[in-house]
Protein backbone atom coordinates (compact mmCIF):
# COMPACT_ATOMS: atom_id res chain seq x y z
CA UNK A 1 0.00 0.00 0.00
CA UNK A 2 2.91 2.35 0.70
CA UNK A 3 4.31 2.02 -2.84
CA UNK A 4 0.87 2.68 -4.31
CA UNK A 5 0.43 5.77 -2.14
CA UNK A 6 3.90 7.00 -3.17
CA UNK A 7 3.02 6.59 -6.85
CA UNK A 8 -0.23 8.47 -6.36
CA UNK A 9 1.68 11.32 -4.72
CA UNK A 10 4.16 11.30 -7.63
CA UNK A 11 1.25 11.82 -10.04
CA UNK A 12 0.05 14.82 -8.02
CA UNK A 13 3.60 16.14 -7.72
CA UNK A 14 4.14 15.81 -11.49
CA UNK A 15 0.98 17.81 -12.19
CA UNK A 16 2.11 20.54 -9.77
CA UNK A 17 5.66 20.63 -11.16
CA UNK A 18 4.53 20.85 -14.79
CA UNK A 19 2.03 23.59 -13.96
CA UNK A 20 4.67 25.60 -12.10
CA UNK A 21 7.25 25.23 -14.92
CA UNK A 22 4.76 26.37 -17.52
CA UNK A 23 3.35 29.15 -15.31
CA UNK A 24 -0.11 27.56 -15.34
CA UNK A 25 -2.61 26.65 -12.66
CA UNK A 26 -2.31 23.20 -11.13
CA UNK A 27 -5.33 20.90 -11.09
CA UNK A 28 -6.42 17.88 -9.12
CA UNK A 29 -5.94 14.50 -10.84
CA UNK A 30 -9.17 13.59 -12.61
CA UNK A 31 -10.78 11.87 -15.58
CA UNK A 32 -13.24 13.94 -17.61
CA UNK A 33 -16.39 11.99 -18.51
CA UNK A 34 -18.37 14.67 -20.37
CA UNK A 35 -18.09 18.36 -21.09
CA UNK A 36 -20.41 21.36 -21.55
CA UNK A 37 -22.14 21.16 -18.16
CA UNK A 38 -22.85 24.62 -16.83
CA UNK A 39 -25.67 24.32 -14.31
CA UNK A 40 -26.56 22.29 -11.26
CA UNK A 41 -29.79 21.21 -12.98
CA UNK A 42 -27.85 19.72 -15.90
CA UNK A 43 -25.35 18.16 -13.51
CA UNK A 44 -28.08 16.51 -11.44
CA UNK A 45 -29.76 15.10 -14.56
CA UNK A 46 -26.47 13.53 -15.52
CA UNK A 47 -25.70 12.21 -12.05
CA UNK A 48 -29.17 10.66 -11.84
CA UNK A 49 -28.31 8.59 -14.92
CA UNK A 50 -25.20 7.27 -13.21
CA UNK A 51 -25.83 4.46 -10.80
CA UNK A 52 -22.16 3.69 -10.58
CA UNK A 53 -20.22 2.21 -7.77
CA UNK A 54 -16.68 3.14 -6.97
CA UNK A 55 -14.19 1.32 -9.10
CA UNK A 56 -10.51 0.66 -9.35
CA UNK A 57 -8.77 1.42 -12.64
CA UNK A 58 -5.23 0.55 -13.62
CA UNK A 59 -3.49 3.22 -15.69
CA UNK A 60 -0.79 1.47 -17.68
CA UNK A 61 0.28 3.85 -20.44
CA UNK A 62 1.77 7.35 -20.64
CA UNK A 63 0.77 9.30 -23.75
CA UNK A 64 1.29 12.71 -25.29
CA UNK A 65 -1.17 14.48 -27.52
CA UNK A 66 -1.58 17.41 -29.86
CA UNK A 67 -4.34 19.26 -28.05
CA UNK A 68 -4.08 21.69 -25.13
CA UNK A 69 -6.10 19.52 -22.73
CA UNK A 70 -4.39 16.28 -23.78
CA UNK A 71 -0.72 17.22 -23.75
CA UNK A 72 0.60 14.61 -21.28
CA UNK A 73 -1.75 12.01 -19.83
CA UNK A 74 -2.22 8.48 -18.52
CA UNK A 75 -4.44 5.90 -20.18
CA UNK A 76 -5.88 2.56 -19.11
CA UNK A 77 -5.99 -0.49 -21.37
CA UNK A 78 -9.32 -1.37 -19.78
CA UNK A 79 -11.57 1.68 -20.21
CA UNK A 80 -14.82 -0.21 -19.60
CA UNK A 81 -15.60 1.61 -16.33
CA UNK A 82 -15.38 5.01 -18.04
CA UNK A 83 -17.12 3.93 -21.26
CA UNK A 84 -20.01 2.43 -19.29
CA UNK A 85 -20.43 5.69 -17.37
CA UNK A 86 -20.27 7.84 -20.51
CA UNK A 87 -22.70 5.52 -22.33
CA UNK A 88 -25.26 6.07 -19.56
CA UNK A 89 -24.84 9.83 -19.87
CA UNK A 90 -24.60 10.34 -23.62
CA UNK A 91 -26.04 7.11 -24.96
CA UNK A 92 -22.93 6.45 -26.99
CA UNK A 93 -19.38 7.53 -26.22
CA UNK A 94 -17.98 9.95 -28.76
CA UNK A 95 -14.43 9.89 -30.04
CA UNK A 96 -13.32 10.85 -26.53
CA UNK A 97 -10.63 8.63 -25.04
CA UNK A 98 -10.73 8.34 -21.24
CA UNK A 99 -7.50 9.67 -19.75
CA UNK A 100 -5.98 11.32 -16.70
CA UNK A 101 -4.21 14.53 -17.68
CA UNK A 102 -0.85 15.35 -16.14
CA UNK A 103 -0.24 18.56 -18.06
CA UNK A 104 -2.26 21.07 -20.07
CA UNK A 105 -0.48 23.20 -22.62
CA UNK A 106 0.50 23.86 -26.18
CA UNK A 107 3.91 22.22 -25.75
CA UNK A 108 5.43 19.49 -23.61
CA UNK A 109 6.67 20.75 -20.23
CA UNK A 110 10.37 21.58 -19.93
CA UNK A 111 11.11 18.68 -17.56
CA UNK A 112 9.03 16.11 -19.47
CA UNK A 113 10.77 12.75 -19.18
CA UNK A 114 8.91 9.75 -20.56
CA UNK A 115 11.20 7.36 -18.69
CA UNK A 116 10.44 9.04 -15.37
CA UNK A 117 6.70 8.84 -15.98
CA UNK A 118 6.90 5.23 -17.15
CA UNK A 119 8.31 4.35 -13.72
CA UNK A 120 4.98 5.43 -12.20
CA UNK A 121 2.96 2.91 -14.17
CA UNK A 122 1.12 0.75 -13.82
CA UNK A 123 -0.70 2.75 -11.19
CA UNK A 124 -3.97 1.63 -9.62
CA UNK A 125 -6.44 4.34 -8.65
CA UNK A 126 -9.83 4.00 -6.99
CA UNK A 127 -12.56 6.34 -8.19
CA UNK A 128 -14.96 6.98 -5.32
CA UNK A 129 -16.31 10.43 -6.18
CA UNK A 130 -17.84 12.15 -9.18
CA UNK A 131 -17.52 15.91 -9.00
CA UNK A 132 -19.07 18.13 -11.65
CA UNK A 133 -17.25 21.35 -12.47
CA UNK A 134 -17.99 24.24 -14.74
CA UNK A 135 -14.68 24.43 -16.57
CA UNK A 136 -12.88 26.44 -19.17
CA UNK A 137 -9.36 27.05 -20.38
CA UNK A 138 -8.34 28.83 -17.14
CA UNK A 139 -8.11 26.22 -14.38
CA UNK A 140 -8.27 28.79 -11.57
CA UNK A 141 -11.75 29.73 -12.81
CA UNK A 142 -13.16 26.20 -12.56
CA UNK A 143 -16.18 26.10 -10.25
CA UNK A 144 -17.54 23.04 -8.49
CA UNK A 145 -21.23 22.50 -9.25
CA UNK A 146 -21.99 19.33 -7.27
CA UNK A 147 -20.43 16.10 -5.99
CA UNK A 148 -21.63 12.50 -5.80
CA UNK A 149 -19.93 10.02 -3.46
CA UNK A 150 -19.92 6.53 -4.96
CA UNK A 151 -20.83 3.40 -2.98
Map each language-model feature to its residues.
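Short, conserved charged micro-motifs
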Residues: 8, 39-45, 81-84, 108-114
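Hydrophobic, ordered structural segments
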Residues: 16, 78-81
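Short, recurring structural edge motifs at helix starts
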Residues: 15-21, 117-119
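Single conserved hydrophobic/aromatic residue that forms the stacking wall/gate
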Residues: 1-11
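Intrinsic, low-complexity N-terminal interaction/targeting segments
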Residues: 81-90, 94
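Extracellular/lumenal glycan-associated surfaces
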Residues: 25-36, 94-106
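Short, charge-patterned binding micro-sites
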Residues: 21-37, 52-77
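Flexible phosphate-binding patches that engage nucleotides and nucleic acids
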Residues: 44-68, 95, 101-151
